[in-house]
Amino acid sequence: MLAEYLLLPLLASYASAVTISVAKSGGNVTTGLQYGAMEEEINHCGEGGLYAELIRNRAFQGSTTYPSNLDAWSAVGGSTLSLQNLSNPLSSALPTSVRITGKGTSGISNTGFWGIDVRPQKYSGSFYVKGSYKGSFTASLQASNGEVFASTQVSSKSVANDWVQHEFTLTPKKKASSSNNTFVLTFDASKASGGSLDFNLISLFPPTWNNRPNGMRRDLMQALQDLGPKFLRFPGGNNLEGQTIEGRWKWNETIGPLTQRPGRATTWGYEETSGMGLVEYMEWCDDLGMEPLAVWAGLALNGDVVPEAELDVYVQDALDELEFLTGSVDTKYGALRAKYGHPKPWTIRYVEVGNEDNLSSGLSSYKSYRFQAFYDAITKKYPNIQVLASTIDMTLPGNAGGDYHLYDIPDNFITKFGMFDSYSDAHPILLGEIAATEYNNGVGIDWSNTHFSLYPWWLGSVAEAVFLLGAERNADKIIGTTYAPFLMNLDSYEWSPTMISFNSNPDDTAKSTSWHVYNNHMTNTLPATSNDTFGPPLLCHRCETAKTNSHIFKAAVYNSTADVPVSLTFEGVGRGTTADLTILTAPSDVSMNAVGGANVVQSQTTKIKAGKQGVFSFKLPNLSVAVLTTN
């Protein structure tokens, strides 16, 4: 039998001694989802990041917002490239292709997402071709100086009036010295009818997490697995909403074969392929043991709102999505899920309706009819699903929960430690986007003139730790918390800071100072008592099993004037009990983990022993995050 409790003490702005006594019973039980991840297509975190596809602009997808183009592509061998919208395209979803015309060796090269990582491993690729051609294709990975790391011949199956897929593998013999590499695809144009061929959906994947086809980048998934998130909030974020109602994220256009996914204009300045679609998100949840999700709520970022009389079709779309995810194979959309390789339904316990509907002039319609329409329909058909509003700025019906977002300066995170103390547990809150983004300035964030840090920095991360302890202290009211945004490609980003930063070289991936703070947190809470009055009530973690009897204490020290002496006792723990005390610090308050740089977070673990009356005595330095675990 397993019983879990949680204690998370806050130590802030004091240097006097602190005495803490931890009780055995009482406290608040969490949802078990206390910390999670948030993903939306921003910062090329999916396209060019977590989604392992190496070819940028692989299918020339475009929209009225971002028209089709030849970004990342260059002609090879003096050939010419031209975009085509043929009468018989690869598919209606992918109508635009590239025509390569030349004489002799001709082709196309791609620079990837600002580089392609090359190392001794198998790369799996494919491309579609239309046109009469009796020769062969050459696919290769090359350095910018022309050095060839791997090359293979692909016999042509191309015909005049149809699109034919060709597959290949590449296995370099050595690792490239940098990621300044290209993928090159060539053919002998003299053997092609009219000296030209049409190409589309040119793809190349490295080995993926769990070797899933169309899968995820291994180093980023490893960083996420090491963090251990318990839920995934997706697909946004603003990207869920779209700039217009028609431009919203449509779940049914992100499933099925890649040839049937049209892609869409993100709200962050570029087109996405939808290669990382609903099923891939759910497989991500499966692989890391996380829970989902969000649905669209009838609001676009441009302020357009679906009128009440027209909302039913969008509510039905949300129900169809839930049927696709959870329905039996006897249902219409459950059968479609099975067709796409997942006969076993997924379990959905939470659905968030929309994103930040208190913004973009959306709150009035959200309160008056939009949220209620989704809430009523979902709870009627799926009574075991908890429906969350995308704001807490409204009166919530039934058992609905809310979502609260906080981007702020570190000092304001400290002042918000107790903000949930008086909040009702009848409507639990998801802290769906949380981050210290800007240095202390005595005021807060001016959203018309922001000065966000490139990376999380140590002072901000410690301030986040303080706020998180306040959230865990109210664990009966808080469903879970996630940093946001989570990922950033340093070569092309729209928002910083993020939990994890990266470029095309997996060796350069940086787990931020905030990653290290979040990595320390637990799940269930138990009150503690203290004879000191330095701040809010203290909390502790205790875990009992048939084989172990352990306790965990956690603390964050923010802006103290000197080391803080701590005397800690756990009820039932006596003299001589040993514990491991791990203290996280950094060289300075502005220390940060940069892409390609060393980890600045210093972790020191020491063994300590309880003295008389079971007292653990130790000191915590300023700007530290600590964990004590009894043995």
Swiss-Prot record:
Gene designation: abfA
Pfam families: Alpha-L-AF_C, ASD1_dom
Gene3D superfamilies in alphabetical order: Galactose-binding domain-like (2.60.120.260), Glycosidases (3.20.20.80), Golgi alpha-mannosidase II (2.60.40.1180)
Record field: pH dependence: Optimum pH is 5.5.
Positions bearing carbohydrate: 28, 85, 180, 252, 358, 531, 559, 622
Record keywords, A-Z: Carbohydrate metabolism, Glycoprotein, Glycosidase, Hydrolase, Polysaccharide degradation, Secreted, Signal
Organism annotation: Penicillium canescens
Catalytic activity: Hydrolysis of terminal non-reducing alpha-L-arabinofuranoside residues in alpha-L-arabinosides
Thermal dependence of catalysis: Optimum temperature is 67 degrees Celsius. 50 perscent maximal activity is exhibited at 75 degrees Celsius. Reaction time was 10 min.
Name under which the protein is recorded: Alpha-L-arabinofuranosidase A
Biological processes per GO annotation: arabinan catabolic process; L-arabinose metabolic process
GO cellular component, one term: extracellular region
Post-translational modification: Residues Asn-28, Asn-85, Asn-180, Asn-252, and Asn-559 are highly mannosylated with up to 7 mannose residues.
Signal peptide: 1-17
Location of this chain's protein in the cell: Secreted
Pathway linked to the protein: Glycan metabolism; L-arabinan degradation
Family: Belongs to the glycosyl hydrolase 51 family.
EC number per UniProt: 3.2.1.55
Role played: Secreted alpha-L-arabinofuranosidase that actively hydrolyzes p-NP-alpha-L-arabinofuranoside. Exhibits significant activity against polymeric arabinose-containing substrates such as arabinan and arabinoxylan. Also hydrolyzes low-molecular-weight and polymeric galactoside-containing substrates such as galactan, xyloglycan, and p-NP-beta-D-galactopyranoside.
Broad enzyme group: hydrolase
A GO MF label: alpha-L-arabinofuranosidase activity
Top-level lineage group: Eukaryota
